Amino acid sequence: MVNPLDSVNPSHALFEGFVQAQTCKETQQNFTELCRHLQVDPKDYKHFYSKLKDRLNYWKAKDLWQKIDKRAAHPDYDQGKACHQNKCLVLGAGPCGLRTAIELALLGAQVVVLEKRSSFTRNNVLHLWPFTIKDLLNLGAKKFYGRFCSGSIHHISIRQLQLILLKVALFLGVEVHTGVAFEGLNEPSGSAGWRANVSPKSHPVADFQFDVFISAGGGKYVPDGFKIKELRGKLAIGITANFVNRHTKQEAQVQEISGVARIYNQQFFQALQSEIGVDLENIVYYKDDTHYFVMTAKKASLLKKGVIKQDFSDADKLLAPSNVNQEALQDYAFEACDFSTEHLLPNLEFAKNHKGQADVAMFDFTCMQRAESASLVKERNGKRLLIGLVGDSLVEPFWPLGTGIARGFLGAFDAAWMVRSWGKGVQPMEVLAERESVYQLLSQTTPENTSKNYMAYSIDPSTRYPNINLSSIKPRQVKRLYEAEEQESKPNKLKKPDIKAKPRKDSMKRLEELLSWCQKNTVGYEHVKVKDLSESWRSGLALCALIHSFRPELVDMSALDEYNIIKNNKLAFDLMEKEFGITPIMRPGDMMTCGKIDQLSMVVYLTQIRNALTEKDTPAAQSNTLSLSRKRSAVAFLNTLKRNSLQRHKDRLASVKGPRQQNMKEKEEKKDVKEESLSSETSACEPCYFCKKHLYVVERESAEGKFFHRSCFNCFQCGSTLRQGGYSFHSDNGRFYCELHSLAEEEEGDEGHGGAQNHTENGSKEDKNGETTAASSPPAHLSIKRKGSYKISVDPDFDESTEFPAPDQDEPPDLEESHQPPKPSELSAENTNMENQQHNINPVPAPRGSRAPLPKPRTVHNVVHEPCNIPEEAEQIPEEPKPKPSLRKLQQSEEEKVDLLSQDSDSETRGSSSAASTSSSSKQHEEEGYWSGGTTWGKSHREQRNRPCIRRKSEPPLPLTGHSQHGKMRSKFSPWNLSSPRLQQRFSVHRVPAGQSQPDQYVSEDDNEDDEDEDEEDLQAEHYLDCEGADFEFSDSEKRNLKRMKTLERKAKMTEIQRFHKAQSIQRRLEEIEVTFKELEEKGVELERALRGETGTGDPEIIDQWIELVQEKNNLLSEESDLMVASRQLELEDKQSMLEMELRRYMEMDDSEKSPEQQKHEAEILQEMLDVVDMRDSLVAFLEEKRLKEVNDQFNSSLDAKRRSTTASQVHWE
């Protein structure tokens, strides 16, 4: 508290004390003294701000008044008269509650805020979207908190944000009462209106009457009348930890971690687990008033470390305070935080919470809640009350997505717009309808799909949400949200859903329609006669006929033998899986040996086939399954990519072993024959491959010819959940692995068993091009010129089956022979072509130029001044006989190697094959705010261009030894290096000689003056300069360069954060799908048992329910496939970043300093990096081709419909 006698002008000193106050109590006390000294009454809310501004004539306050005046002058507020007759009660003085109160005060309403706590103690740090930063700056945040957003990552602690908003709210005449608990609403009685039931009862606010109530008190304070929807995922345990920030230089130099996710950075978490026993899903580190860490921990790890005393299936019991060892929790958090910052933070000490205890907490966010509606109106005794929700009460955020404050502020603006309409006398039903129309968009909002004109943001939703329809929901649809008096007297009867199937005349109609469709599309084929849904399909010819009927180029019916049942079914199953993503329901041998074909299995399989083959004939506006099969076929392609990647690794290991590889190949072939013979003896009702328990059709999953429960599909090494498109299979031991443990197991097996595992994952896999490889002599190399102008010598039989020309490739590969990779569709037909053929294709055309380019991530690059050539001797392929080459010989100039590194490793192919997809499942989960292929990841084309660079000061190269690659390397395990390797280098200011100027080539096209204006005050920040204790005078050009450098770094960090949020969104949605799958399978098993007569209730009517459930499961599979494609793109992007970082370190070393071992390791890194680039290019080309197919199918479908309508309308004259 400031003593007025200490200053010449006491009001100035009081104002300074108020602005600089760092606690809620101090802020309120200084504000009270300031008002008393200036003789202004805060309760005179209509005139308080104008009187305060007139009486406080202080130059430091003028800038703040200008900002507030500019905001208040917006037409939406109608000069503070829009709601001048309304009285509003806001529950909760959190950021969202205070932000709502500010808007209501600007509208002219009398606003009272209730807060149960007496102090602001939450040190947790919030991520800020760009518009929230601009919004807070416009409210004067920089005046109240000088370090606001001065770093490269935009964030602020909850406590500081509350203080900023509290001070603005007090200036605008908002009454804020702390230490007052809200206990409910008191309905009107007599002449009294709506009031609040509070504790203590004697508090004056208990007499406050209001007609608007805004709940911003969190999920626990949702008023009666609102229905809550719960989104369940797998058990998710979060841990937050705050450490004391002493603001030393050593602490300032520690890099923040904007987000590391296991979904694309498994090596970091593997090191964390192996070294200290801490098993996490993700971790974030922000630096603010405290060192703030937040992470998601695995239950098994917490139990093992003694953090959780006893295991319970119920999350509340599991995380109850009595079941948590606080000391063990502190140790767990300390070890994780210390390891993730590489032990660079000195003297880590926990900050204290409001109870004086260590500020470390564990919480459950397994279930996310959101309100089904955002508002309602209650009418009692002729008096109406408008109730709205904001903040966590409205939508509980998933913390790794960083959406809490952004969507919270958007919801606050939307609520203020609703109150504005209420104050202007709009009919209640219309107010509710418009509010719900806006609410439908809130959970979908991202920084990408909201308006970029942040300066134009206001409470009007049209300034924030592009193409919004404020009348999408009609007043008649929100009648339930208006509670009148007469409704209360009626009993609230809820209709229970009738879960029993109702008898219908067409109970078997679905089966008959399916059979009729099969007969229609197989009629006329020789030796094919479909009479039922079981035995007619035994030979496999009927399945091949179905495929040929729609895709004749895939099957040569004349080459099929009616009696070769296994071959026919294998061909059909393979084509269905690779072309349409439909996994087989049984082995080819089962179709020949089983006594009776299982009808339910065939119904499931044929239903998927019909959906896949007929989806292109369905109009886009009516189809719910458009492109579902193509999404799933993309996952089949991912499996091919992963198999080829693993095969290349095996071949490189095998090339060292030499002659024994041929022996291993022969043994493998014998094993394949044995496995095929064994499979033919298996019945269709075989048990789960893993647990050996009974496997019902509805719960059957398959991979690599194995059938199993979905819940049993886990990595053999670590037990992590595996999914289609994200596993590796070792055929020698029949085990499935995640990618992280697949290569490790391969290398260990090769060392321990003499190369016993150097073969493909699937023993029956043939060479993609149908070529045989001579083992006697190595073939001549081919010279290929790749993008980035680097040349690669490659053996002609090198397995390039999954590589395609990139969509934007300007010139074809310079091949000495015309060896071109096949199309994705031709990959699927490999078993069809029994002869050796070469497939000639044209490059995939680039997408239309009308598609908006994505913002360029990671725009800050380093220029390597003296790149060195890799000696060819380091990469010579052994001359001993081998089936395939181990490494491609590299012939690169200095410029070519620099060009290779200048290619950005970030993914600009955020799309998937579903860019134009309108599947119902995608739409459903867009509403929940999770990742959707049609929005955030809609761009499926990678624009190739070199990135601009910033010169970095020269540094001595770090010593790299052969041993270091097996130990703990920063480039391998450091999360920030993996996420954004270029930005971790320290920058220095280079003096520009007189008369010269630096080109502005590194300025991204979306830079603007607004970004630079806010950077002016932060130029001297120690965070950005490499000047230790020096006093610098910057020239104008240097200031411009530093501001732009800072802007680039900040934007690159934002891109990094967005990538983390996308990874977490994918992970969260995958976990929710997993829970939904389990529920569907449980229902499906009950129905299937009833259909098979196991429960004695074999009602044929249940078949409809069962088929609907199977269709719902198929839709989830399609969504999961889309997510896996996006996950794979992130994974490859991150892997390239890691390899690029390691390669740069070698290139910065002089050739003379490199040992032979280092040269060899450099060559291996470069080879692996090229493999990753190939895989990314292949995936891009595949997805682009799929997208073009979808566009073409939709176009042809619309043309056909137009032709039919034109033909029907023609008049024929006799």
UniProtKB/Swiss-Prot annotation:
Residues 686-748 form the LIM zinc-binding domain. GO terms for biological process: actin filament depolymerization; sulfur oxidation. Monooxygenase that promotes depolymerization of F-actin by mediating oxidation of specific methionine residues on actin to form methionine-sulfoxide, resulting in actin filament disassembly and prevent repolymerization. May be involved in endosomal tubule extension and neosynthesized protein export. Its cofactor is FAD. Residues 910-922 have a biased composition (Low complexity). FAD binds at C96, E115, K116, R117, R122, N123, N124, F182, Y292, D392. Residues 1-488 are annotated as: Monooxygenase domain. It catalyses: L-methionyl-[F-actin] + NADPH + O2 + H(+) = L-methionyl-(R)-S-oxide-[F-actin] + NADP(+) + H2O; NADPH + O2 + H(+) = H2O2 + NADP(+). It is found in: Cytoplasm; Cytoplasm, Cytoskeleton; Midbody; Endosome membrane. Residues 484-505, 649-676, 747-1019, 1194-1214 are annotated as: Disordered. This is [F-actin]-monooxygenase mical1. Residues 508-614 form the Calponin-homology (CH) domain.
